[in-house]
């Protein structure tokens, strides 16, 4: 039981770090002191460290169980997980193609961020969050072990919480333009028109 609590606490640490450094007040304070590149380095480094801590907290080392212990393999779950993971990866690539130029450039220059509503963003406001959830669900299907499920469920929960806070930040930043966009595109699933 304690091992699950450790995973939950370590995953929560990642969530607090990620949301904390993403909050406008903290972000602006760091940018004022160390610039956009400094913020980017701090955010990336601390995100990697806290996610690595959460990952290692699982103390799970049987990543190739399907080779070393093939009797544990559940083909339907495994194949479903591969399909779900590939779907999530493709969705992440599609979303990144649309935002990568704008978002990455905005962090490295003084350009003002633009509201992206093209491509996959025309149907889903947060496709990267959906892609993350699909990949985490795939991990549960491919690795049907309780400790892996706890880790993935913690990160899925944080993803939804992060999407909620991101949504609030976008409404504040873009105002009516974003409120209009919300009418046309679904939160995390495509809006049926």
Predicted regions and their residues:
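Transmembrane alpha-helix boundary signature
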Residues: 58-66
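Cytosolic-biased juxtamembrane loops and peripheral soluble domains of multi-pass membrane proteins
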Residues: 23-39, 67-193
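Hydrophobic cores of alpha-helical transmembrane segments in multi-pass inner/ER membrane proteins
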Residues: 13, 50-54, 83-91
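A generic, lipid-embedded transmembrane alpha helix
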Residues: 42-59
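N-terminal signal-anchor/start-transfer transmembrane helix
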Residues: 9-27
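Alpha-helical transmembrane spans of integral membrane proteins, capturing the lipid-embedded, hydrophobic core
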Residues: 7-15, 48, 156-157
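Feature marks short, highly hydrophobic, charge-poor N-terminal signal-anchor/signal peptide-like helices
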Residues: 1-5
């Amino acid at each position: 039981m304690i091992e699950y609590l450790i995973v939950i606490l370590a995953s929560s640490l990642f969530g607090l770090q990620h949301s904390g450094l993403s909050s406008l007040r903290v972000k602006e304070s760091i940018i004022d002191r160390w610039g956009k590149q400094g913020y980017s380095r701090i955010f990336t480094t601390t995100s990697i460290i806290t996610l690595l801590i959460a990952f290692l907290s699982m103390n799970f080392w049987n990543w190739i169980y399907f080779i070393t212990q093939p009797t544990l393999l559940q083909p339907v779950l495994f194949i479903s997980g591969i399909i779900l993971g590939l779907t999530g990866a493709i969705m992440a690539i599609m979303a990144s193609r649309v935002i990568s130029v704008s978002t990455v450039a905005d962090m490295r220059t003084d350009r003002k961020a633009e509201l992206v509503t093209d491509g996959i963003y025309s149907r889903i406001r947060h496709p990267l969050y959906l892609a993350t959830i699909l990949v985490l669900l795939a991990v549960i299907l491919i690795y049907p072990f309780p400790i892996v499920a706890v880790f993935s469920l913690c990160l899925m929960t944080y993803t939804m919480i992060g999407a909620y806070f991101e949504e609030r930040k976008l409404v504040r930043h873009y105002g009516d333009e974003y409120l209009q966009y919300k009418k046309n595109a679904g939160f995390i699933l495509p809006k049926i028109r």
